[in-house]
């Protein structure tokens, strides 16, 4: 019984290094797959961040076009005007009062 327990702790450094490298490699692949899956489910995430940043910028609001009522923001790539239109995270753009 003691020889089995002792042999488990007498692993060569090469085997330990290989196990650690394998674990790190698989962890990296798992994280990369999560990132790719998230990007596939939310393809406009980067555009959304740019949209939110532009909507908070009052100096450049005249350079952006207002979306038509119920026009889909992500499909049309239209940045809403500050104060007149709202582009929610998901769904359609809408104007105040529509």
Curated annotation (Swiss-Prot):
Name where it's found: Secreted
What biological function has been recorded for the protein in this entry? Answer: Putative ion channel inhibitor.
Q: Which positions does the propeptide occupy?
A: 41-64
Which keywords does this Swiss-Prot/TrEMBL entry list?
Answer: Disulfide bond, Ion channel impairing toxin, Knottin, Secreted, Signal, Toxin
The organism named in the record is Cyriopagopus hainanus
What is this protein's record name? Hainantoxin-XVII-2
Disulfide bond sites? 66-81, 73-85
Q: Does the keyword Thylakoid apply?
A: no
Lineage at the top is: Eukaryota, Metazoa, Ecdysozoa, Arthropoda, Chelicerata
Q: Does the keyword Disulfide bond apply?
A: yes
Reported tissue expression = Expressed by the venom gland.
Q: Which family does it belong to?
A: Belongs to the hainantoxin family. 17 subfamily.
Q: Tell me where the signal peptide lies.
A: 1-40
Q: Name one GO molecular function term.
A: toxin activity
């Amino acid at each position: 019984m003691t020889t089995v327990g002792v042999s488990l702790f007498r692993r060569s450094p090469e085997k330990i290094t290989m196990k650690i490298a394998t674990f790190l490699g698989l962890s990296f692949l798992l994280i990369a797959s999560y990132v790719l899956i998230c990007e596939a489910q939310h393809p406009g995430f980067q555009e959304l961040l740019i949209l939110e940043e532009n909507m908070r910028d009052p100096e450049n609001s005249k350079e952006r076009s207002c979306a038509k009522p119920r026009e889909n923001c992500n499909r049309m790539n239209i940045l809403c005007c500050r104060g007149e239109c709202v582009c929610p995270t998901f769904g359609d753009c809408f104007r105040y009062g529509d």
